[in-house]
Each structure stands twice: as structure tokens, then as C-alpha cells.
């Protein structure tokens, strides 16, 4: 039985999160094309499929959000150096979004740290995550 077969609330939330991330990518795609560029979609490295512990999963999420933030900050710096005000304005939405994403990831690392490997705590955290609301942008 797969994860989505027995945990439909969490799976639904994860799929909604995936759609949100796709919409974020499309913002970049559309912006580049609207500005006369040609956005090219390339393959990205798959995330790890195996983790040593639930703690490691959430730490991986947090580390990934930090990596995304660094990339966005580099783009902001480049736009400023190029005096590209339209791109700077466009990127501010992502700067703000990453503050929220990093805070959320850090909160999850903290919660899983409190729960540890206790099955009841993991179950309750899983239920909480399944009830998350995902922004529609």
C-alpha cells in the first residue's frame, strides 16, 4: 500500500503543495518570456527517496529552503547590479515567500525534535501536516 492509499489527507496536502511550487516556477517562466527572454525548462535533480529518520527529512526540507533562499538572493543581487528594476520588483515576492517558507521549515524541525521517534507524536504531527492550507497565490 502506498502512502496516498492510507493517508489521503496528507497526500492531498502534498499534491496541493506541489501545485503551489509549480505555480511559483511558472511565475519565473512567464516573467522571463514576457521580458523577451526564452525560458528553458531543464531537468532537476530528484530529491532523496530514503531518509534515516523523520528528523532528517525535516532538516532536509529546511536545508533545501535555505538553498532556494540563497539562489533568490543571488538573483536579487544580480538584478541590482544590472539596475534591472523590473526584475528586482518581481523577485521581491519570492524574497517574502522564502521568509515564510524558511520559518515554516524551521518550525517543523523544532516540532519533530520534540516528537522524536515516538509513534503517537509522529501520528499527531502527520495529522497536523495533512490539515495544512496551501496558498493559491
Q: Where do the protein language model's features map onto the residues?
A:
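Single conserved hydrophobic/aromatic residue that forms the stacking wall/gate
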Residues: 1-10
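Loop-to-helix transition at the N-terminal end of transmembrane alpha-helices
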Residues: 11-17
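Long amphipathic alpha-helical coiled-coil segments
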Residues: 41-43, 76-87, 116-125
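Acidic/histidine-enriched, glycine/proline-rich intrinsically disordered or flexible terminal extensions
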Residues: 119-137
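Alpha-helix capping/hinge segments and adjacent helical runs
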Residues: 33-38, 112-120
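Acidic/histidine-rich alpha-helical segments that form the ligand environment
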Residues: 16, 30, 46-111, 137
Amino acid at each position: 500500500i502506498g502512502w496516498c492509499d492510507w493517508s489521503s489527507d496528507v497526500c492531498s496536502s502534498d499534491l496541493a503543495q506541489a501545485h503551489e511550487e509549480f505555480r511559483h516556477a511558472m511565475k519565473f517562466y512567464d516573467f522571463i518570456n514576457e521580458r523577451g527572454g526564452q525560458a528553458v525548462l531543464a531537468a532537476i535533480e530528484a530529491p532523496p527517496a530514503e531518509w534515516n529518520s523523520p528528523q532528517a527529512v525535516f532538516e532536509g526540507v529546511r536545508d533545501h529552503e535555505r538553498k532556494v533562499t540563497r539562489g533568490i538572493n543571488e538573483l536579487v543581487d544580480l538584478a541590482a547590479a544590472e539596475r534591472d528594476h523590473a526584475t528586482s520588483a518581481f523577485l521581491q515576492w519570492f524574497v517574502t515567500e522564502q521568509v515564510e517558507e524558511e520559518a515554516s521549515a524551521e518550525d517543523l524541525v523544532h516540532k519533530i525534535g520534540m516528537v522524536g521517534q515516538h509513534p503517537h507524536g509522529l501520528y499527531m504531527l502527520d495529522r497536523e501536516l495533512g490539515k495544512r492550507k496551501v496558498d493559491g497565490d
